[in-house]
Amino acid sequence: LRLVTDAYEPGSVFKTLVAGAGFDLGVVRSSTSFEVPASIKVGDDTVTDADKRDYTMTMDVREMMRRSSNVGFVLVGRKIGADDFAAYVDKWGIGHSSGVDFPGESLGIVKERDQYDGATLGSMSFGQALSVSPIEIARAVGGIANGGVMMTPHFYKSSKGDEKDWGEGERAISEDAASQVTSCMQTVVSEGTGVGGAVDGYDVAGKTGTAERADENGGYLKENYMSSFMGFAPAQS
């Protein structure tokens, strides 16, 4: 199953985990506002938003999530700081086995804190400069849905009436932080980039991701993207 054995750059789906870290630390809340420029330097690179849209404005974190602003999340990442950012990447289980009961799980490529360069924090803040398996991201986002507690994923074929012991899970962020992320993700689906993920009769929380594909010769391929959506329902704000 490729969601276990393959790794990819998660792109903007990763912003949910960055927001969760910021909320948990208390350095930002969903209502915290930033003056967001049209572009920002990350190491030697200049980061813009998708299609070079100019989102120069005052934006709070909820609006950054709704618009999926790369530039905005670079600012959030800087607010968190490299040391805490790396610690929360670890707390989210990124770069570690999810524990799924299927062989061949890819751990992707995730830099340790002492491997960070001038571009790492900024790039990872919007889901580049790392690769992960979809099951890792699903486990982490499932933790948001579960009030901040991540569970070990399993392939479950059917129930024969026996009660299953799924364990207690592993807390990544506080329940309040998870609630804030969930609320932002609901806004993404109701009026943001994720409106296509809406389902009639369900309150859906979700986040879109559009990642540039890495070039085997270095850098990224132009006009070549990988799109994704990660969400859950019913959402509890």
Task: Name what the model sees in each region.
Residues L1-S12, L17-S237:
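Beta-lactam-recognizing serine transpeptidase/beta-lactamase-like catalytic domain environment
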